[in-house]
Amino acid sequence: MYTHYLKNLISFESVTPNSAGAVEYIDGLLKQHGFKTEIKIFGDSKNERVTNLYGVFGSNEPNICFVGHVDVVPAGNHEFWHNSNPFKFHEQDGKIYGRGAVDMKGAIACFLAASLNFIKNNMDFKGSISFLITSDEEGKSTHGTKEMLQYIYDQRYKIDFAVVGEPTCEKEIGDTIKIGRRGSVNFKLNIVGLAGHVAYPHKANNPLPCLIKILNELTNIRLDEGTEFFQNSNLEVTNIDVGNDILNTIPASAEACFNIRFNSLHSVETLSQLIEQIIKQYCKEYKVDYKLEYSSSAESFVQNPNDNDKIKEFADVIERTLKIKSEFSTSGGTSDARFVKDYCSLVEFGLLSEMAHKINEYTKISDLQKLYDVYYNFLMEIF
């Protein structure tokens, strides 16, 4: 059943932020099985219009919601794929190939199969099962899950617990549950000096020595030692640009970009204050001006599994089903869980992350079965 759903989902060329019919396919499937559904399209311009779906079966508490995305990253050169078509289901040696097989159409297919089979076998269950699906997670994530969550809550829907189907596992299904994510903030620093001829440095003010000093301190600073659930925060320089092709000219300005992935010991505000304090110190010393810009896609968050019964229940289901004890993790990049956590508690749990976004992306059929079993048994446990 899940392979059938996955075959159909892969066939939609849903490169972010386009649904390409994938959201509509899920909508039709849910309607056939008695779900109340609504599709909402958010976004202003043609290139930013995002298709979102909320479908719910039942009206009682608790409401267990699967949160997922049908959009995928571009497939690259199709000639490098096994069958030269990343959007055509290809099965070989117990594996299913196709863009989105891992991230995250495989998880959607498994939760569809698990929930529909559960409802079929337990028509009188007390509670609700719902789906929140978007076509904008791999891109800007502006008009997807974030806006849809606000919309459904404005419509008086309440989610009690969410399963986000991101590919979380490392080596085998069940080894990792994400219970939080690091925050991310990007900085752009421009140091403004005074241009001049290299033969007359006293008539100029080179911005580069100041920038080098600043970057040296920033890259050597130890932001923290990590926490129980987080690794230490980390700063990486991502770009240095002078824009000067004339070798005998001192540049007028120099720019650097850097990113900080940070844990729950920090916020965007505290980090920006720390960074600016260091910059001011060196700019004063070198008598140069500066402009600092920063933007953040997410603050850090974590949910302590010791304080959340449903997270513990989910981990217990994995251990009973797959005979493996999961590690609680906050590693990796950002995901739509950063929006969901403002409304309810959650876990992120899906397939292996190794092949996500790669040429010849695939998942093992045996892994799909394991994921299906966990999802189904979790519904049995909750209801």
From Swiss-Prot:
Q: Which domain of life is it from?
A: Bacteria
Required co-factor(s) are: Zn(2+); Co(2+)
Positions that bind Zn(2+) 2: 103, 138, 357
Q: What class of enzyme is it?
A: hydrolase
Active site (UniProt): 71, 137 (proton acceptor)
Give its E.C. classification number: 3.5.1.18
Q: Which reaction does it catalyse?
A: N-succinyl-(2S,6S)-2,6-diaminopimelate + H2O = (2S,6S)-2,6-diaminopimelate + succinate
Q: How is this protein organized at the quaternary level?
A: Homodimer.
Q: By what name is this protein known?
A: Succinyl-diaminopimelate desuccinylase
